[in-house]
Amino acid sequence: MSQLRKAPEGILGFPVAPFNREGKLEEEALYENIRFLLDEGLEAVFIACGSGEFQSLSTKEYEQMVEIAVSAADGKVPVYTGVGGNLSTALEWARISEEKGADGYLILPPYLIHGEQEGLYQYTKTIIESTDLNAIIYQRDNAVLTLEQIQRLTDLEQLVGLKDGIGDMALNISLSYTIGDRLGWLNGMPMAEVTMPAYAPIGFTSYSSAISNYIPHISRMFYEALLNGNDRLVKEIYEQVIIPINEIRKLRKGYAVSLIKAGMEIMGLHVKNTARPPIVPVEKEHCRQLENILKNAMARYPKTTAAL
């Protein structure tokens, strides 16, 4: 566990939770998938978050996933966990994260309730102050804090970043320009590569990458082209890979998670196209469409051409 008060930067890994056909967590597969992300150069691991089906995990499974992530990372990159939901569970899982050696956590929305700004502030503050771990706010769904509330939270040294999942660019510009480098700014929109051309210029130069779970070298090519001003390559990858995959993602609710698993299975990685309800597995026809996209992507952008 590191005490560095800084949000992770770059392409951030969000591993899925690999379940077998009976719905049991496959620990060895999770370890191998995390090692794959690290071998491909991802700058951090965010375990048991949205992509890891946080909402479906038991406390025992959560502990297992955190232990595996910390072991796989072996101190080479920071490990962040997902905490949130009802407050008592969030505090328990924050404590578990600290005990298991994580570096920080991503604070997910409270369960069900649409609170007032003061209530959301108190919810977030309580979790942040409960441990000495780094904390990242996640703006999404029923938990969207205003500039005023986030400025109040910056008084807490544990707060190191903000991840946006709503796409309110006016708010994002206000946040990043007003608060500046006091926080790290993360793009957490579904299929974040889609919006990175808009986010990077306003300081959101880090992002959670779904496709890095199965074609990380292409995500890396896109990211480096974006930062280096290679507009031709950005446009090409955008049109040939990112938009086609995103069009499939939008076909069903829950595909933001299950399409990752389908892509990993197609690419021969250690996961099956299974998910826990209410998320549904990817339908066969959509799997075939994704397979064709990936086949063409690998032919056009073979791994040896990636700048890793």
UniProtKB/Swiss-Prot annotation:
Q: Which cysteines are joined by disulfide bonds?
A: none
Tell me which domain of life the UniProt entry assigns to the organism this sequence originates from: Bacteria
> What species is given as this protein's source?
Bacillus licheniformis (strain ATCC 14580 / DSM 13 / JCM 2505 / CCUG 7422 / NBRC 12200 / NCIMB 9375 / NCTC 10341 / NRRL NRS-1264 / Gibson 46)
The reaction(s) annotated as catalysed by this protein in its Swiss-Prot or TrEMBL entry are: 5-dehydro-4-deoxy-D-glucarate + H(+) = 2,5-dioxopentanoate + CO2 + H2O
Keyword set includes Lyase: yes
Q: What is this protein called?
A: Probable 5-dehydro-4-deoxyglucarate dehydratase
Query: Which top EC class is named for this enzyme in its record?
Result: lyase
Q: Which GO terms describe its molecular function?
A: 4-hydroxy-tetrahydrodipicolinate synthase activity; 5-dehydro-4-deoxyglucarate dehydratase activity
Q: Which HAMAP family match?
A: KDGDH
Q: Which residues form a coiled coil?
A: none
GO terms for biological process, alphabetical: D-glucarate catabolic process
Q: Which family does it belong to?
A: Belongs to the DapA family.
Query: Pathway membership of this protein?
Result: Carbohydrate acid metabolism; D-glucarate degradation; 2,5-dioxopentanoate from D-glucarate: step 2/2
Acyltransferase found in the keyword field: no
EC number(s) given by UniProt: 4.2.1.41
* Matching SMART domains: DHDPS (SM01130)
Q: Which NCBIfam families match?
A: KdgD, PRK03620.1
Q: Which UniProt keywords apply?
A: Lyase
